[in-house]
Protein backbone atom coordinates (compact mmCIF):
# COMPACT_ATOMS: atom_id res chain seq x y z
CA UNK A 1 0.00 0.00 0.00
CA UNK A 2 3.03 2.28 -0.19
CA UNK A 3 1.70 3.66 -3.49
CA UNK A 4 -1.67 4.63 -1.99
CA UNK A 5 -2.51 8.31 -2.26
CA UNK A 6 -5.07 10.66 -0.77
CA UNK A 7 -6.62 13.82 -2.16
CA UNK A 8 -5.31 17.08 -0.67
CA UNK A 9 -5.61 19.76 -3.36
CA UNK A 10 -9.10 20.08 -4.85
CA UNK A 11 -9.55 20.51 -8.61
CA UNK A 12 -10.89 24.10 -8.46
CA UNK A 13 -7.86 25.19 -6.41
CA UNK A 14 -5.49 23.50 -8.86
CA UNK A 15 -7.19 25.12 -11.83
CA UNK A 16 -7.04 28.48 -10.08
CA UNK A 17 -3.33 28.04 -9.39
CA UNK A 18 -2.34 27.32 -12.98
CA UNK A 19 -4.71 29.83 -14.62
CA UNK A 20 -3.56 32.49 -12.15
CA UNK A 21 0.08 31.78 -12.97
CA UNK A 22 -0.70 31.90 -16.70
CA UNK A 23 -2.46 35.25 -16.33
CA UNK A 24 0.52 36.76 -14.52
CA UNK A 25 2.97 35.62 -17.19
CA UNK A 26 0.66 36.61 -20.05
CA UNK A 27 0.02 40.03 -18.48
CA UNK A 28 3.74 40.69 -18.37
CA UNK A 29 4.22 39.55 -21.97
CA UNK A 30 1.33 41.57 -23.38
CA UNK A 31 2.47 44.69 -21.50
CA UNK A 32 5.95 44.32 -22.98
CA UNK A 33 4.58 43.71 -26.50
CA UNK A 34 2.91 47.10 -26.35
CA UNK A 35 0.05 48.84 -28.12
CA UNK A 36 -1.22 46.05 -30.37
CA UNK A 37 -1.57 43.70 -27.40
CA UNK A 38 -3.05 46.07 -24.83
CA UNK A 39 -6.61 44.91 -25.32
CA UNK A 40 -5.51 41.37 -24.42
CA UNK A 41 -3.65 42.83 -21.44
CA UNK A 42 -6.93 44.34 -20.29
CA UNK A 43 -8.85 41.09 -20.78
CA UNK A 44 -6.24 39.36 -18.64
CA UNK A 45 -6.85 42.03 -16.02
CA UNK A 46 -10.56 41.23 -15.97
CA UNK A 47 -9.79 37.54 -15.65
CA UNK A 48 -7.35 38.16 -12.83
CA UNK A 49 -9.90 40.15 -10.84
CA UNK A 50 -12.35 37.28 -11.19
CA UNK A 51 -9.71 34.79 -10.10
CA UNK A 52 -8.88 36.88 -7.03
CA UNK A 53 -12.53 37.04 -6.00
CA UNK A 54 -12.83 33.29 -6.50
CA UNK A 55 -9.72 32.57 -4.40
CA UNK A 56 -10.80 34.78 -1.52
CA UNK A 57 -14.25 33.16 -1.42
CA UNK A 58 -12.74 29.69 -1.84
CA UNK A 59 -10.48 30.51 1.09
CA UNK A 60 -13.58 30.62 3.28
CA UNK A 61 -15.93 28.13 1.64
CA UNK A 62 -13.65 25.64 -0.14
CA UNK A 63 -12.34 22.27 1.08
CA UNK A 64 -10.09 21.96 4.09
CA UNK A 65 -6.66 22.72 2.64
CA UNK A 66 -7.92 25.57 0.44
CA UNK A 67 -9.20 27.49 3.45
CA UNK A 68 -7.18 30.32 4.95
CA UNK A 69 -7.80 28.89 8.40
CA UNK A 70 -5.77 25.80 7.47
CA UNK A 71 -2.54 27.61 6.64
CA UNK A 72 -2.52 30.98 8.41
CA UNK A 73 -0.60 30.55 11.64
CA UNK A 74 0.52 32.57 14.63
CA UNK A 75 3.97 34.23 14.38
CA UNK A 76 5.34 31.75 16.93
CA UNK A 77 4.29 28.79 14.75
CA UNK A 78 5.78 30.41 11.66
CA UNK A 79 9.07 31.04 13.45
CA UNK A 80 9.15 27.46 14.72
CA UNK A 81 8.71 26.22 11.15
CA UNK A 82 11.42 28.56 9.82
CA UNK A 83 13.88 27.28 12.44
CA UNK A 84 13.47 23.74 11.18
CA UNK A 85 13.05 24.57 7.51
CA UNK A 86 16.66 23.79 6.60
CA UNK A 87 16.56 20.32 8.09
CA UNK A 88 16.58 17.68 5.37
CA UNK A 89 14.55 15.34 7.57
CA UNK A 90 11.68 17.65 8.46
CA UNK A 91 8.20 16.19 8.00
CA UNK A 92 6.51 17.47 4.82
CA UNK A 93 3.42 19.60 5.31
CA UNK A 94 0.12 18.13 4.20
CA UNK A 95 -1.25 21.39 2.81
CA UNK A 96 0.48 24.76 2.62
CA UNK A 97 3.30 25.04 5.12
CA UNK A 98 3.32 28.17 7.34
CA UNK A 99 5.74 30.05 5.07
CA UNK A 100 3.89 28.95 1.95
CA UNK A 101 0.70 30.27 3.50
CA UNK A 102 2.30 33.69 3.83
CA UNK A 103 3.27 33.54 0.16
CA UNK A 104 -0.36 32.84 -0.78
CA UNK A 105 -1.49 35.98 1.05
CA UNK A 106 1.39 38.04 -0.35
CA UNK A 107 0.54 37.06 -3.94
CA UNK A 108 -3.16 37.81 -3.43
CA UNK A 109 -2.36 41.26 -2.03
CA UNK A 110 0.22 42.16 -4.68
CA UNK A 111 -1.93 41.02 -7.60
CA UNK A 112 -5.00 42.73 -6.10
CA UNK A 113 -3.02 45.99 -6.03
CA UNK A 114 -1.93 45.38 -9.62
CA UNK A 115 -5.41 44.65 -10.94
CA UNK A 116 -7.04 47.35 -8.82
CA UNK A 117 -4.72 50.14 -9.92
CA UNK A 118 -5.09 48.96 -13.52
CA UNK A 119 -8.73 50.04 -13.43
CA UNK A 120 -7.64 53.67 -12.98
CA UNK A 121 -4.48 53.83 -15.08
CA UNK A 122 -3.87 55.64 -18.34
CA UNK A 123 -1.05 55.92 -20.83
CA UNK A 124 -2.09 59.58 -21.34
CA UNK A 125 -2.45 58.90 -25.08
CA UNK A 126 -4.96 56.21 -26.05
CA UNK A 127 -5.66 53.61 -23.37
CA UNK A 128 -7.35 54.25 -20.04
CA UNK A 129 -8.93 52.08 -17.39
CA UNK A 130 -12.73 52.18 -17.07
CA UNK A 131 -12.54 53.96 -13.72
CA UNK A 132 -9.96 56.49 -14.89
CA UNK A 133 -12.63 59.22 -15.28
CA UNK A 134 -13.52 58.81 -11.60
CA UNK A 135 -10.17 60.19 -10.39
CA UNK A 136 -8.14 63.31 -11.02
CA UNK A 137 -5.28 63.40 -13.49
CA UNK A 138 -2.72 63.49 -10.67
CA UNK A 139 -4.34 60.53 -8.90
CA UNK A 140 -4.45 58.58 -12.16
CA UNK A 141 -0.76 59.33 -12.65
CA UNK A 142 0.05 58.11 -9.15
CA UNK A 143 -1.95 54.91 -9.61
CA UNK A 144 -0.29 54.33 -12.99
CA UNK A 145 3.10 54.63 -11.30
CA UNK A 146 2.05 52.15 -8.60
CA UNK A 147 0.75 49.82 -11.32
CA UNK A 148 4.10 49.91 -13.12
CA UNK A 149 6.29 49.54 -10.05
CA UNK A 150 4.17 46.98 -8.23
CA UNK A 151 4.81 44.41 -10.93
CA UNK A 152 8.46 44.41 -9.88
CA UNK A 153 7.36 43.13 -6.49
CA UNK A 154 5.20 40.50 -8.18
CA UNK A 155 8.20 39.33 -10.21
CA UNK A 156 10.27 39.16 -7.01
CA UNK A 157 7.54 37.17 -5.23
CA UNK A 158 7.23 34.76 -8.17
CA UNK A 159 11.01 34.34 -8.22
CA UNK A 160 11.01 33.58 -4.49
CA UNK A 161 8.18 31.07 -4.99
CA UNK A 162 10.05 29.27 -7.77
CA UNK A 163 13.26 29.30 -5.73
CA UNK A 164 11.38 27.71 -2.82
CA UNK A 165 10.05 24.98 -5.11
CA UNK A 166 13.58 24.22 -6.32
CA UNK A 167 14.90 24.28 -2.74
CA UNK A 168 12.29 21.80 -1.54
CA UNK A 169 12.88 19.54 -4.53
CA UNK A 170 16.68 19.45 -4.44
CA UNK A 171 17.49 19.95 -0.76
CA UNK A 172 14.51 18.40 1.02
CA UNK A 173 13.48 15.91 -1.68
CA UNK A 174 9.89 17.18 -1.59
CA UNK A 175 8.13 17.63 -4.93
CA UNK A 176 5.60 20.45 -4.58
CA UNK A 177 4.66 20.69 -8.26
CA UNK A 178 3.29 17.23 -9.05
CA UNK A 179 0.67 17.22 -6.23
CA UNK A 180 -0.57 20.57 -7.57
CA UNK A 181 -1.19 18.79 -10.88
CA UNK A 182 -3.11 15.72 -9.75
CA UNK A 183 -4.06 16.81 -6.23
CA UNK A 184 -2.84 13.72 -4.35
CA UNK A 185 -0.15 13.08 -1.77
CA UNK A 186 1.08 9.74 -0.34
CA UNK A 187 -1.21 8.13 2.22
CA UNK A 188 1.85 7.66 4.43
CA UNK A 189 1.97 11.46 4.74
CA UNK A 190 -1.74 12.24 4.77
CA UNK A 191 -3.86 10.64 7.53
CA UNK A 192 -7.33 9.71 6.39
CA UNK A 193 -8.94 12.44 8.49
CA UNK A 194 -6.70 15.07 6.85
CA UNK A 195 -7.62 14.12 3.28
CA UNK A 196 -10.54 15.73 1.46
CA UNK A 197 -13.35 13.55 0.18
CA UNK A 198 -14.15 15.56 -2.94
CA UNK A 199 -13.35 18.73 -4.88
CA UNK A 200 -16.80 20.22 -4.18
CA UNK A 201 -17.33 21.07 -7.85
CA UNK A 202 -20.92 22.28 -7.51
CA UNK A 203 -19.90 24.73 -4.80
CA UNK A 204 -16.96 25.82 -6.98
CA UNK A 205 -19.36 26.50 -9.85
CA UNK A 206 -21.49 28.74 -7.64
CA UNK A 207 -18.42 30.61 -6.38
CA UNK A 208 -17.17 30.99 -9.98
CA UNK A 209 -20.51 32.49 -11.03
CA UNK A 210 -20.35 34.94 -8.12
CA UNK A 211 -16.81 35.96 -9.13
CA UNK A 212 -17.82 36.38 -12.78
CA UNK A 213 -20.88 38.35 -11.72
CA UNK A 214 -18.73 40.69 -9.67
CA UNK A 215 -16.45 41.40 -12.65
CA UNK A 216 -19.48 42.03 -14.86
CA UNK A 217 -20.98 44.38 -12.26
CA UNK A 218 -17.66 46.19 -11.84
CA UNK A 219 -17.31 46.88 -15.56
CA UNK A 220 -20.99 47.63 -16.12
CA UNK A 221 -20.86 50.38 -13.49
CA UNK A 222 -17.71 52.05 -14.78
CA UNK A 223 -18.13 55.83 -15.24
CA UNK A 224 -17.34 55.73 -18.96
CA UNK A 225 -17.13 52.81 -21.36
CA UNK A 226 -15.33 53.23 -24.66
CA UNK A 227 -13.37 51.11 -27.10
CA UNK A 228 -10.11 51.98 -25.40
CA UNK A 229 -10.93 51.24 -21.79
CA UNK A 230 -9.47 48.62 -19.51
Features from the language model and the residues they span:
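Membrane-embedded alpha-helical bundles that constitute the cytochrome b-like, heme-associated redox core
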Residues: 1-230
Amino acid sequence: MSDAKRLVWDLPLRLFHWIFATCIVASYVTAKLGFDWMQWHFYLGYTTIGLLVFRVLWGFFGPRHARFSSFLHKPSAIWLYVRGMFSRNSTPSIGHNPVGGLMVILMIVLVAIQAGTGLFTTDAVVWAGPYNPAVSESTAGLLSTVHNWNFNFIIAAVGLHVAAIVFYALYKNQNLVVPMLHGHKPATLVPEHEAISSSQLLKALVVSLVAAGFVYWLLAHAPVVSDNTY
